[in-house]
Amino acid sequence: MYKQIAIALSTFLAFTSASLFAQSPTKGQAQNWHQWRGPYSTGVSLTANPPTEWSESKNIKWKVKIDGAGSSTPIVWEDSVYLLTAINTKVVDPEKPRPEDQPMRVFGIKHPNTFYDFFVLCLDRETGKEKWRQKTIRKVPHEGHHGDNDFASASPVTDGKRLYCWFGSAGFYCFDLNGKALWKRDLGLAHMGASLGEGCSPTLHDDKLVIVRDHQRQSSIEVLDAESGQTIWKSEREEGNAWATPVVIKHSGRTQVITAASNRIRSYDLYSGEIIWECGGLTGNVTPCPVIQGDNVICMSGYKGHSVMSVPLSSKGDITDSGVVTWKQTRGTPYVPSPVLYDGLLFFNQSNSSIWTCLDANSGDTLMDRTRLPGIANIYSSPVAAADRIYVTGRNGQTLVLGKSKELKVIASNKLDE
């Protein structure tokens, strides 16, 4: 099985510059794409200028095949691209039940009985050639995953000194940027409801790594020291399945870690683990990542209902149904993709469909209401934006280039044969 990366000047690798919407990254981070959703967790670059047109023969800089499967986003630091993959060795563990002997599960999910190799890869950004690879572990995963997921779903993160790679129940691994192993941690097994698979990415701030594990047993949030990998604090959470990567923001003298989940949106103090505030109001299986707009955080969900809400960062305690929430809407929100926040405009799709909405991020007013995007039907990937354009890719390989506009403006439509 192969995962193929087709990198044009129009793709993710072009988005390697600064944004102004959330916490201030370091100078190096601002000039790179060092984590999931970029340096400001919004999916936006303010200075990149990717092309609007490409095809199999136009504006493709390089293309390489990657063994295995991994739905995590590659990250970029200077001249290197880092990504994760899990390769099925097809070597059978005779002590594990065969898939055909297992009970019927929802979505036909089977637990594997073969060993997987979990790899970290580094590619040359200019040529696509492999610079190094490191195998972190060989093991049989304890659970299966949904057909749209895999065993390498969390995106790596770097501070320019070290590379942090999270394979969920297969472990947390740290390397220097030349591939030298520095530390590793086994944080235990997660038991996802319906065996849907893991997917929350780590967040890095002030030499601290944040890991949220919301699943069907004891959910938790854990903060590790980035240099040593040792746990600084860990707090249990009452949550079911969720895959939303947290966002970190300093506000009013405190550094808040904001997590979105079905029972509560919560703000934790990064250094102590204290809950600063919490608020109910999202639906289940929360996957979209929070974004920061001014003095508010915007969270959303789109599974078995729709909810998007803007919560003041100055909140204290449990503010559920208190009237403190700045604004809320209950339609058109995404299930899997995260939103784009661009110059005060909040763009997102409905569920996993191609129905497109734009809100005023400050007021919550609807500027473009559930408008169908042409040429694509299903959307799982999160959109990215630059140069007053938004790039939305469907599962059929079609990418629409949209204008950053309160009305639908299609600039171009491009397809790769992947």
Each predicted region: which residue ranges?
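Bacterial N-terminal signal peptides that target proteins for export
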Residues: 1-9
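Low-complexity, intrinsically disordered regions enriched in charged/polar residues
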Residues: 3, 14-15, 27
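Noncatalytic, solvent-exposed loop/strand surfaces
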Residues: 21-418
